[in-house]
C-alpha cells in the first residue's frame, strides 16, 4: 500500500475509534482476539472437541437433537461448571419442564439459579435481552426454541394459520441480542428440537425449528444423539451419547465427542478420565487392573471409577494433566494446519503470478 493510502487509512481508523470507541475496529493480528474465555461443558472430551476448552463466552450457542438425547442435561452441566467458577446463571424455561431436584443432583446450585417461565416467546426473549444488557449474568439457557410461541398464536384459535411467525420473532430477537451478548461477554445457549422436512428424497430430511436465523447467528452448533444404552445386568442405567460440533467459529468444526450420561447423575466424568487416561498413557492397564503413577486404583472400570469418585484430589490431578495435554495438542494441530494452508496459498499465488 502506498504512503498516501496508509495515511488515509490511519485517519479513517482514528475517526472510527474516536466516534465509536476504542476497539470498534482493529487488525486481526493486533490483538489476541481468538483467546476466547470459555466455560467447561462438564465433559472433557467435548471440551477438547470444541477446541478452546468449552463453550465460548460472548457468543450464541445452539444445542439440538432428538427427544431424550441429553440436551437439557448438557446445559445443566454447563450451569454447574459456570457456578463452580463463580458465575451467575439464568434458565429461561419456555417448556415449563425444569426439574430442580434433577438439576441439584447434577451439581447445580438451585438457590442461586435465576429461573423464568415466560408465557410467550416475546416475553422470553425480552427477559433474555434484559438479563444480557444488565451485564451481571454470565450464562443464559433458553429451553427451548420450539416452545417460544408467538403471542399472536397463543391468543388465536387452535386451527388458525401462523406461517413464519416464530421464524420472524427469532430473526428480530437475534439481531438485537447479538451485539449486546458480545458487549456483555455473556454466553447464551439455545436448546432446539428436530423436525422432519416433508418430501425430501435425497439428503438429510432433519431440520431445526425457528427458521434459519439461529443457524447463522450461532458461533457453535452441537448435534447431540443417544447412540446406545448403559446396562447393569438387565437394568438400563444411562445412555451412551455422541456430540458432533457441526459449526464452530472459534476453532475447527466437525469434531466428535462420546461420553456417558448416567440417569440421576449426569455426565460421567470418571468414565471419561479412565478412557482418555488409558488412551494417552497417563493410566496403565494391566489385565483388569488400572494403575496411576504405579499405584493400583481398581480392578475393572467400575471399581476404578468408584476410586476416582472417592479420591477427588487424584481425579482433579488426572483431569488437569489430560486437559493440558489434549488442549495444547489440539492448538498445535490447528496451528500446523493453518501454517500448511498459508504455505499452499502462497505457493498458488506464486504460480498464478
Curated annotation (Swiss-Prot):
Gene Ontology molecular-function annotations: ATP binding; ATP hydrolysis activity; ATP-dependent DNA damage sensor activity; damaged DNA binding; single-stranded DNA binding
Biological process annotations from GO: DNA recombination; DNA repair; SOS response
Any one of the GO CC terms: cytosol
InterPro entries in the cross-refs: AAA+_ATPase, DNA_recomb/repair_RecA, DNA_recomb/repair_RecA_CS, P-loop_NTPase, RecA-like_C, RecA-like_N, RecA_ATP-bd, RecA_C_sf
UniProt biased composition (Basic and acidic residues): 334-345
Any Pfam family: RecA_C
Keyword tags: ATP-binding, Cytoplasm, DNA damage, DNA recombination, DNA repair, DNA-binding, Nucleotide-binding, SOS response
Nucleotide-binding listed as a keyword: yes
Entry's localization field: Cytoplasm
Predominant localisation class: cytoplasm
Family: Belongs to the RecA family.
NCBIfam families, per database record: tigrfam_recA
Known function: Can catalyze the hydrolysis of ATP in the presence of single-stranded DNA, the ATP-dependent uptake of single-stranded DNA by duplex DNA, and the ATP-dependent hybridization of homologous single-stranded DNAs. It interacts with LexA causing its activation and leading to its autocatalytic cleavage.
Protein name stated in the entry: Protein RecA
Source organism per UniProt: Edwardsiella ictaluri (strain 93-146)
